[in-house]
Amino acid sequence: MIDYKINEILVKQLNDDYNCSICVDPVLNSLPLEQHQALSCKNGHLLCQACWGKQLALRKECCICKIKVESISELCRNIFLEKGFRNKKVHCPNGFENFKVDEKLIKDESDGCKSVITIDQLESHLRECEFVFIECPNDPIRCKDKFRKNQTDKHMNKCQYVTINCEHCKEPVIKNDMPTHIENDCSIISLECEFCKDKFGRRSLENHIANECPNVVIDCPHKEGGCTARIKRCYLSQHLTEEDNHIRYMQKIIEKHRIQVEESDRIIKKLRVDYKELEKRVEITSRYKGNWTIENWSQKLTHYPNNERLKSPYFCIGSKSFYVGLYPNGFNQTNAGFMSIFLHLYEKPSTSTTVVRFSFELLHSDPTKSLKFEKSNKYTENKGSGFSQFIDIKMINNFIIDGKLTINIDVEVIPPSSSLVTK
């Protein structure tokens, strides 16, 4: 739809009471109407919202009477004037051409909408009006036509970009592309075989030449066994009957295939062995799974007061060495009454970072009641990471089995990620 202002489609011009004192246009001059208001200062001087915005940006006063106006919210809304404006009659904007001459709308007397409605009815009318200009629904990029909505059927009958079915193969094709489709793509159009001169559909022709045409020259099927003959397909049976050495050619082919199968089997078996070995290596260099059993737990609980730890044996993941530190009576006074447990990376301080995902699982005689916590951490030096309050000491007796405490340890070193940049 062409751009327009409401004062361009009025049946009768408005008197000055409805106009802005600065731009002289109606204060309500565009849709949607609910976004516009008739606003005046306390002395009744009326401006449109756009002009009020510009005026208050320059000076906080009415440009006519100079009364102070700090913001739009201080202005008065003239609802009586708005109601009168909404009752004014206008022509439907779809009653005009979709272009202007000398910045003026041109009435379309033959094909345009003839409706005359109130300004208040305008928006609802436009939602249903069949005279609105639309773009081609087939291909608005290639088809530049614009037409009224009620003329869609007429346009579709002549549009070169409508999709139609090929009369031969029934495939959907854009009308403008139909000659190219018939020339190059249609599978039903009959084409002549260059060898036997019979006619076939394009799709059938390819199969005919590859597998059926009697005049196509082909290799002997025993070429792989040593037969170098090339004959027309129609003479193939005769060739195979007359040549008594084809059994020897077949034996050569069979033997060659047997050797290839044996070699393939050997390679597959080796790949399976190599794969299993690589799986083991990857597991060793990136992950450790095991358990740490602490015997005589009750004695340990007595002999290791708060802030003193038990230290597990070292275990390695690739070149990294780790150990677990366990505080039976808690790490420092804050965590007294709890068992604390930490994973330590044992290496000299380094600028590189080792990212580790790990878990500790305290085993219960009933596996469904085992206690497990997991965590991730970035290590740059020999500092522990873990759980200061892993379990309340009062509850730990439920996990003692034959005087032993067993902890499952699962530690995985996450490979570092890197960004590659080319300048």
Swiss-Prot record:
GO terms for molecular function: zinc ion binding. Pfam families: MATH_2 (PF22486), zf-TRAF (PF02176). Signal peptide: none annotated. One of its GO terms (cellular component) is cytoplasm. Probable adapter protein and signal transducer that links members of the tumor necrosis factor receptor family to different signaling pathways by association with the receptor cytoplasmic domain and kinases. Belongs to the TNF receptor-associated factor family. A subfamily. This is TNF receptor-associated factor family protein DDB_G0277243. It comes from Dictyostelium discoideum.
